[in-house]
Amino acid sequence: MAITLNGSAGITTPTYGGSVSAEYITPVTGFKNRIINGDMKIDQRNGGASVTPTSGQYPIDRWQAALTQSSKYSVQQNAGSVTPPAGFTNYLGVTSLSTYTVLTGDLFDIRQKIEGFNIPDLAWGTADAQTITLSFWVRSSLTGTFGGAIKNADATRSYPFTYTISSANTWERKTITIAGDTSGTWLTDNNAGMQVGFGLGVGSTYSGTAGEWAGFNFVSATGATSVVGTNGATFYITGVQLEKGSTATSFDYRPYSTELALCQRYYQEVTWTLRTYSVNGYLYYNYCALPVTMRAIPTATTLSTAAEALVFVSAFAPVSVNSVRSGFAASGTGDAYIWERKEALSAEL
């Protein structure tokens, strides 16, 4: 009799005596990808709308824009509405808004900061540092050598890398293997442990030799193509994966609900309503658990407010990594309420 697990023969027992043989089945591993939203399908803030970012802004979830000059590029989920590579439905699209000559101290890139809790097994900063492999799909209206970098939280260690785009307006898969850094400080707590960035135009101050670890804040490799140098140039990317080992494996597809929850650890939007029979001058509060525990106690920003009645002053504040408090002081006696106030909670790295 054969026992079959997931379509593979596992343990076979003979019908009439004899020995028992066991066949080893390679275990299925999950969460090999340290990048969150690598397939660019979550965009809580902008819902697919185009953004001309300021430095530090997140055009789509977990992906941050860094820039030293404003209004040089826009970012949009699925910009240009091209067909993504097979297996993907979304991508991050950058469009240059000018013909800009990058200055020595300029930098433009799209990056993701990886929480330290997600990289302790890499053992970077020690003699046991593990090799990693970065893989992704990229498409650009430009061809040539492009660059990026991996660095630690305080940017005292960095590894510039290059890759070549051979054909314009064609999706190409790139793979870069990087020996783990045996030096520097690589945090393994709830702060940023590692940064991965893709250059869009970087001056010489922040450009270094590709393929080498350096004790400096390099954002890209020397001589890399500048996307912001050509008006209307496009740069699209998806399927970004960073994994332990020297081999690029297939993309780590995770359920939408799982990927959304991973993003909500750093940013989420909540809508709250509070309604009660009030007495003039009294305070009314409500505590609510968040759907996902956040990385740290978040900051709150009011996005929108609908109707309210008999409210003198209202308040909303996070009280922990997994709960918030909302409330108001009543301005009269009767049916008092705040209706559908929307708040953004951010605990980004």
Regions found by a protein language model. Name each.
Residues 4, 11-17, 22-349:
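Extracellular and organelle-lumenal recognition/adhesion modules and their flexible linkers in secreted
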